């Protein structure tokens, strides 16, 4: 498996991946109204626009895009909020560790950006996945209207990186 930055040639496969997730795994856990909103936002132009301000990654298996996820900063200059965004794995690849490796890659990118924690707006069906990856529910960020659960994971922020660098 190869994890790399998303390129323009990946836009159509990523749109298809997002739509398949909305129609498949998420359909059992979310209202039709919420899914319709997600679907409306899953356009090629939307993903191209995101590439300009997010670190968007794809995971390839045998040359095919099988997963995608992004690192976004939804905070302000003085208060960054590093967030996992648009995270999808093709359903036939669930359980193979691809999502886990992609999420670790995104966490490392956040850590490299100086983040001390990583946030994710989890869909209802993915809460267990994120819990296994070290995230916990952040009750301070309710978002029931969008049928998502905000979760947070501590990272090795700059202070921890400095301590590790000082060790022999």
Q: Where are the predicted features?
A:
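Conserved N-terminal entry element of GNAT/NAT acetyltransferase domains
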Residues: 1-12, 156-168
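Active-site acidic-Proline motif in GNAT/NAT acetyltransferases
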Residues: 90-96, 124
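Short glycine/proline-centered loop/turn elements that form peptide/ligand docking sites
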Residues: 99, 103, 124-128, 142-149
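Amphipathic alpha-helical recognition patches that constitute DNA-binding helices
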Residues: 13, 83, 117, 125
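Conserved hydrophobic/aromatic "anchor" residues
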Residues: 93, 129-130, 135
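Acetyl-CoA-dependent GNAT
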Residues: 5-9, 16-92, 103-105, 109, ...
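Conserved GNAT acetyl-CoA-binding A-motif
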Residues: 110-123
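Conserved catalytic-core motifs of GNAT/GCN5-like acyltransferases
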Residues: 119-121, 133-153
């Amino acid at each position: 498996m190869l994890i790399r930055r998303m390129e323009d040639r990946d836009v159509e496969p990523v749109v298809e991946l997002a739509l398949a997730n909305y129609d498949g795994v998420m359909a059992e856990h979310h209202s039709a109204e919420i899914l319709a909103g997600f679907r409306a936002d899953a356009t090629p132009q939307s993903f191209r626009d995101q590439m300009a301000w997010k670190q968007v990654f794809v995971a390839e298996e045998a040359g095919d895009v099988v997963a995608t996820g992004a690192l976004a900063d939804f905070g302000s200059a003085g208060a960054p909020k590093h967030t996992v965004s648009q995270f999808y794995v093709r359903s036939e690849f669930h359980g193979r560790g691809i999502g886990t490796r992609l999420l670790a890659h995104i966490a490392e990118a956040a850590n490299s950006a100086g983040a001390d924690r990583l946030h994710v707006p989890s869909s209802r069906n993915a809460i267990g996945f994120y819990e296994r990856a070290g995230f916990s529910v952040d009750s301070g960020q309710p978002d029931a209207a969008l049928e998502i659960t905000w979760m947070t994971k501590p990272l090795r922020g700059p202070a921890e990186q400095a301590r590790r660098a000082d060790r022999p």
